Swiss-Prot record:
InterPro entries given in the database record: Chemkine-bd_vir, Orthopox_35kDa, Pox_vCCI-like_sf
Domain of life: Viruses
Residues making up the signal peptide according to the UniProt record: 1-17
Residues bearing glycans: 67, 151, 172
Pfam assignment, any one: Orthopox_35kD
Organism: Rabbit fibroma virus (strain Kasza) (RFV)
Alphabetized UniProt keyword annotations: Glycoprotein, Signal
Family: Belongs to the poxviruses A41 family.
Protein name, as recorded: Protein T1
Length: 258
């Protein structure tokens, strides 16, 4: 009974928090992104996930001169390299340049690139046998400690600019996993009725990858219906790109890599 009460209290708190932050001015938009990848490898391999996670930020801006200026900072930890460059776009708070996340685990090294997209806060992975799942997503605004809101005009620009890239390579990494429990729930993003162009460059190492499924959902996180949403998908089977429209990928319980 005590456990049931705790669960109910958590649910009630989450409900009120959701309604509280989402019930704001009509032109306040909370945009998020959710990327799910399922890789079927050619052979079974390591089931160790989250062996390494590296994040690189790149966002050029116009300086005083004719050329773009660049500011770079390297952290002390050799396993993590961060590059900071600053952009003067009106979409303050979002990374307008490119952000790259490299996840090593399950016998793969996968780099995701996000250009002009909402910030990814959660990275998680699952591996068993030949199957590897990876998910990258924004935090729901009621769970985010510093949720970023924009207006409709800015949201439309975000939908136009956001592009993702994927580079999947084989990996023989032997480092033990670093996980932080089960991954948190992905944000609920308003379902888009039509497919858009979000997925850009995709590189796949066919020496170890047999099949690949990718879905990307981009849009509002506070509204049941909205025209401010896009989705895209990609499917590779036996090394061939297929024109299938996959709406969603069901994932098992993933482990948090950050």
């Amino acid at each position: 009974m005590r456990r049931l009460c705790i669960i109910l209290l958590v649910y009630v708190y989450a409900t009120f928090a959701t309604k509280g932050i989402c019930k704001q001015d009509e032109d306040v938009r909370y945009m998020g992104i959710d990327v799910v990848v399922k890789v079927t490898k050619k052979t079974s391999g390591s089931d160790t996930v989250c062996q390494a996670l590296r994040t690189t930020f790149e966002a050029a801006h116009k300086g005083d001169g004719a050329n773009d200026s660049l500011s770079t900072e390297y952290v002390d930890d050799y396993s993590e390299e961060e590059e900071y460059e600053y952009d003067e776009s009106f979409l303050e708070g979002f990374v307008i340049g490119s952000t790259y996340y490299t996840i090593v685990g399950g016998g793969l090294s996968v780099t995701f690139g996000f250009t002009g997209c909402p910030t990814v806060k959660s990275v998680s992975e699952y591996a068993k046998g030949r199957i590897v799942f990876i998910r990258l997503s924004s935090d729901a605004p009621w769970r985010d400690t510093n949720p970023m809101s924009i207006n409709r005009t800015e949201a439309l620009a975000l939908l136009e600019k956001c592009e993702t890239s994927i580079d999947i390579k084989c990996s023989n990494e032997t480092v033990s996993e670093t996980t932080y429990g089960l991954a948190s729930l992905a944000p609920h993003i308003t379902q888009a009725t039509e497919r858009g162009n979000i997925i850009g460059s995709t590189l796949v190492d066919t020496d170890c990858v047999e099949n690949l499924d990718v879905t990307v959902h981009l849009g509002e996180m506070c509204r049941k219906t909205s025209d401010l949403s896009k989705r895209d998908s990609l499917k590779v089977k036996n090394g061939e790109l297929l024109d299938d429209d996959t709406f969603s990928i069901h994932t098992p319980k993933l482990k948090a890599c950050n």
